[in-house]
């Protein structure tokens, strides 16, 4: 009887799980391979000493939002912190999408846009990218308007392809679509061309950012939503109180203050990306897709075989197994040692 209590639309979902795999090199989640150094850890510990663990967090996450405001060059009143971008996506949907209303995203893209919408009672419509994973902007606009979409979600750079939309393309979408447009810039630091400065010009633009990738802080689950003041005040109505822990706020503030450290880390990751692309390009039987992120999407003749071979050699990468990406693997850019391990193992099974 108890199963009748649950939403019908939950029946097609399975709980998100991370498989327990035996590996030594982890290149499946687009994390930074750089651990925070001793100086950064010391600064973080000093910040945490001031946390009042008996008190609820600052509900507005004021200090970390001010730090992010300085980092991104956007007014503080246009920024809201969240418990990772995932929570911010859920808040956007809760604020804007009623039951049976539509959101739209593209395929391939981050799957949780659609999942969170459908869990909340909305409908997720999928617009297909072409064979080379390019977006037909005109057809997207037409489809979004015909379907009366409430929110359009696009990651830029795209996850998992690594491709980017140019600012002019995004402007065209913003001008043409009768809906809120969420540009998820989780990987923007690896590309450096952001749309965030346009929030003052476009009333339907929402930008998402994260500390998980470029700032090597995935463990703390800290994201930011950036939009115009009216949009933000309305979205805040759907935000849970005290949603970002005091520890997360303290660590985020410490990391964001060290802009030179972040810059040097990005240079390191970009250098390793160039190294990995150069070495992978020598294999003639695979297809690399140009990337502006910290990962590389690769098409193999037998992706499942390559995935299992790498895993047998203690290297885990992202295996999609089905759908449009069943012949693809996504490999996170790792350290030089990790990247060389990938190349050395692939050289034993590829030409």
Swiss-Prot record:
List where this protein forms a coiled coil. Answer: none
Q: Which reaction equations make up its catalytic activity?
A: L-histidinol phosphate + 2-oxoglutarate = 3-(imidazol-4-yl)-2-oxopropyl phosphate + L-glutamate
Alphabetized, the UniProt keywords read: Amino-acid biosynthesis, Aminotransferase, Histidine biosynthesis, Pyridoxal phosphate, Transferase
- Provide the assembly information: Homodimer.
Q: Which organism is it from?
A: Clostridium kluyveri (strain ATCC 8527 / DSM 555 / NBRC 12016 / NCIMB 10680 / K1)
**Enzyme nomenclature, EC number:** 2.6.1.9
Q: Which gene encodes it?
A: hisC
Pfam families referenced in this protein's UniProt entry, alphabetically: Aminotran_1_2
Tell me the protein's name: Histidinol-phosphate aminotransferase
Q: Which GO terms are recorded in the biological process aspect for this UniProt protein?
A: L-histidine biosynthetic process
Keyword Acetylation appears in the UniProt entry: no
Annotated family: Belongs to the class-II pyridoxal-phosphate-dependent aminotransferase family. Histidinol-phosphate aminotransferase subfamily.
